[in-house]
From Swiss-Prot:
One of its GO terms (cellular component) is chloroplast. Keywords: Chlorophyll biosynthesis, Chloroplast, NADP, Oxidoreductase, Photosynthesis, Plastid, Transit peptide. This is Protochlorophyllide reductase, chloroplastic. It comes from the Eukaryota.
Amino acid sequence: MALQTASMLPASFSIPKEGKIGASLKDSTLFGVSSLSDSLKGDFTSSALRCKELRQKVGAVRAETAAPATPAVNKSSSEGKKTLRKGNVVITGASSGLGLATAKALAESGKWHVIMACRDYLKAARAAKSAGLAKENYTIMHLDLASLDSVRQFVDNFRRSEMPLDVLINNAAVYFPTAKEPSFTADGFEISVGTNHLGHFLLSRLLLEDLKKSDYPSKRLIIVGSITGNTNTLAGNVPPKANLGDLRGLAGGLTGLNSSAMIDGGDFDGAKAYKDSKVCNMLTMQEFHRRYHEETGITFASLYPGCIATTGLFREHIPLFRTLFPPFQKYITKGYVSEEESGKRLAQVVSDPSLTKSGVYWSWNNASASFENQLSQEASDAEKARKVWEVSEKLVGLA
């Protein structure tokens, strides 16, 4: 997302190793569920009383465990006032950068419980502690978007937690701009498109049913876009430009064997693979809007929160790049945005009542005021969006 001039500067790369998760699904901290160990204490004077009080205690514990699933609007019997429960928001890639900043902004508002969907459980736990997140305001769950099995397991684990889903934020991304040869996901897809687009596509399709069931006043599905995939901007015209072509590479499975590892079927380019994946993200958001907004009332949106020049997305670049890129964005392009500010902007798209319009690509001006931005022809092509959707369905096993 913060890639306005990334393609013009030298860099090196390496593929990060997958984090290993040691937490058991039975660990109460994984789902934010309170322990039952103290709930059955009592001094009973008769067997009948013992049974009665035991039933009362167990009922109370069940109510506490299922607290997140209570109706969105609760009415106080004493005062007759309506109060909103906390909303539940899943954020992918919430252990660093924009994802962590957004988690912090939402958790500190007191209105949201954040589900941090991350590849590395321990990294996420340390990040949450470092950010000062109160334990009652977040839950960490394992998700590796480079594995479709992991995506399905995450959805299964989330549903077992019995938490409702009110907002889904597809934020996580990988970026290997200097890669000369493609790397691949567990399912054999080129890693940038496989992670940034296909992993999120499957996650969104599966969790759509959970969003539909939400009784929250404003349920939303948000996909983080990028200015580099929007070719009607200066940054979007920095070579190599995003271009999905006729999707022959995507239709072939992006395997690099019988088909190209690039969506357009061309020669591999790591920077272009990332940009193409962000075009897919923005096309997918619009196709979700066309297919489901009127039926479900869900708000589907994308955004570019600004150039986060210090983000970990550039962690594989050489030290010189990491040193020069932030001041270049601050003083030359004037597009620099801190992680904290970008997190507030994404949190705004999550909860601001004025940003409920569906099918919109949000951006911000220099005064940090949000506005509806225009997408390029490539990123707003309805027919291409339909084709990307249909091919993606086949690749992830939904068709």
